[in-house]
Amino acid sequence: MRIIAGRWRGVPLAGVGKGDPGAHLRPTPDRVREALFSMLTSRGAIEGAHVLDLFAGTGALGFEALSRGADSVVFVENGRVGQRLITDNIAKLDASDQTRLLRCDATRCGPWSGAPFDLVFMDPPYGKGLGERALAAVRDWLAPGALVVWEENASMIPPEGFAPVDQRKFGTSHITLIARV
């Protein structure tokens, strides 16, 4: 797994190959990340953004956003393997001044006192309803109009307080783009 574009283009990230079912890690494939970031770039959603990466895993989506011009990323990951990989990648990219790792369950992180987030990546374990619960938990962390990129194994219906923006299917992955209203 590598950074696709931007200042860290081509830099390999610490990862788990095609995944680690025991650690519930399922990295988003390069071709899906390329298509996703093309969608976000065309909307002007990355440059200068404050990014929240929920169920961050390796942090690949957040690091890709930083590489392409986001101002900061907060990674939320409760698994030890994912936390170690994110910490390793922060060190590898010398990105500690632009990143923060919250070691908590994305559905129960409590209040946030920092800047509101403009862009959210959310790739929960498929089919467990965790995406809906995480959005409810962090809704007040988000700026009005914030974009949420939700990866699941089916198209998702936006919960109350969010509006649909776009949906795409890549193999077994469905990307649902919604905005906070």
For the regions a protein language model found, what residue spans apply to each?
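Class I S-adenosyl-L-methionine-dependent methyltransferase catalytic core
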Residues: M1-V181
